Swiss-Prot record:
The keyword Transcription regulation applies. This is Transcriptional regulator MraZ. It comes from the Bacteria. Belongs to the MraZ family.
């Protein structure tokens, strides 16, 4: 199951987020997991993807300080959320605060997961990094062809 596209949405007054219909149709009647992401985002995964992803983290050595830190930051900031009958999820307050989300969000399909960004934060991220995209793409592409 692949998620793709960028969608502009708003939280309602009860801090619920409507999942875009193209994404929602892929995850109806299932549980999803919302976690602290990277660069100020949140990440949403299906149960199957969350189990794969979290097992990779949890299989790292707990004797390593960085492993403990990333486990604390991500796994401890993950919540199992239900999708209601009309395709909304309630994002817990602590995650909204971590991502500086108040109302307006972008929902980004990222293949195996969905990123949820505060719109201003994502716009700033894009502006700060747009000049580097070609350079990064070249570096990654060269690494794939070795």
């Amino acid at each position: 199951m692949l998620f793709f596209g960028t969608y502009d949405h708003n939280l309602d007054d009860k801090q619920r987020l409507t999942i875009p219909s193209k994404m929602r149709n892929k995850i109806l009647n299932s549980t999803v997991y919302v976690s602290k992401g990277f660069e100020g985002s949140l990440e949403m995964r299906t149960e199957e993807e969350f189990e794969k992803w979290s097992s990779q983290i949890l299989n790292l050595s707990s004797f390593n300080k960085e492993t403990r830190m990333i486990t604390r930051e991500i796994i401890a900031n993950t919540h199992e959320v239900e999708i209601d009958k009309i395709g909304r999820i309630k994002i817990p307050n602590n995650l909204l605060k971590l991502a500086n989300i108040e109302k307006s969000v972008y929902i980004l399909g990222m293949g195996d997961r969905v990123e949820i960004w505060d719109q201003k934060s994502y716009d700033n991220y894009q502006n700060d990094n747009s000049d580097r995209m070609e350079e990064i793409a070249e570096t990654i592409y060269q690494g794939l062809n070795k």
